Amino acid sequence: MVKVYAPASSANMSVGFDVLGAAVTPVDGTLLGDVVSVEAADHFRLHNLGRFADKLPPEPRENIVYQCWERFCQALGKTIPVAMTLEKNMPIGSGLGSSACSVAAALVAMNEHCGKPLNDTRLLALMGELEGRISGSIHYDNVAPCFLGGMQLMIEENGIISQQVPGFDEWLWVLAYPGIKVSTAEARAILPAQYRRQDCIAHGRHLAGFIHACYSRQPQLAAALMKDVIAEPYRARLLPGFSQARQAVSEIGALASGISGSGPTLFALCDKPETAQRVADWLSKHYLQNQEGFVHICRLDTAGARVVG
């Protein structure tokens, strides 16, 4: 049997709409991600378990893990009979790359089970394709960091899908999921079809400056440039209490904050553990809306999807 864990990810990071994403892991050792197991069988079977298994489609063929198996078999040109188990630890529609976790874990597990017939580039292309079935368009800002780890910049030129951007070891990512769902498709539909010239210029300046600051090792500058003129001004209205939360975490001392992916999870960057804890405490009390919500203090997950058993 092969068992693969794929970590949560925070896409966009305010400054890089659809082109930046970071894999994250809680500092307390909690597994924030999905696990998929694969073993040989006489015919295909899929079993779901985990905290959020009851949120999955009841029809197996609608489950993205089934679709991963089906597409992987197509890529190899043969049917591979396996029993798969999805441990769904990630809330759906959370802005933490829930579907990317399932896709990355399923495809890496299948590839390992079959002796690695597909290279990383081919696997990543399949992940983007399958993620696109859920979000409505192919984009890699969750699957790339989830699969490869670290902070990833989407390139999509010269046969290169993404490349890693150096992160900062001192950064702590406070992630607060309020317990409500935001559809990626709905969050994309709310965005304008066209943008003002000054917003396009500001976006380019912020993103170029952020990448420069990462490579020139200027964490304060990098954090200061994490501004969103593309999505947040429009998506904030979908997130109850988001604007107040951003103001509060800034006053506590967060270096930057914004919407993780398409929301509703909020991320806040801190460079001191005590600041991160105060931010986490405030968000736990004021941003969470029900028992399904949670707050985690995280660091970059540099390993990405990996075999755990």
UniProtKB/Swiss-Prot annotation:
GO terms of molecular function: ATP binding; homoserine kinase activity
Record-annotated membrane-spanning stretches: none
Catalytic activity, reaction form: L-homoserine + ATP = O-phospho-L-homoserine + ADP + H(+)
Compartments reported by the entry: Cytoplasm
Keywords from the named record: Amino-acid biosynthesis, ATP-binding, Cytoplasm, Kinase, Nucleotide-binding, Threonine biosynthesis, Transferase
Annotated ATP binding sites: P91, I92, G93, S94, G95, L96, G97, S98, S99, A100, C101
GO terms of biological process kind: threonine biosynthetic process
Main localization, broad class: cytoplasm
Pfam families referenced in this protein's UniProt entry, alphabetically: GHMP_kinases_C, GHMP_kinases_N
Keyword Transferase: yes
Family, similarity comment: Belongs to the GHMP kinase family. Homoserine kinase subfamily.
Protein name: Homoserine kinase
Species, as recorded: Salmonella paratyphi B (strain ATCC BAA-1250 / SPB7)
Lineage of origin: Bacteria, Pseudomonadati, Pseudomonadota, Gammaproteobacteria, Enterobacterales
The gene coding this protein: thrB
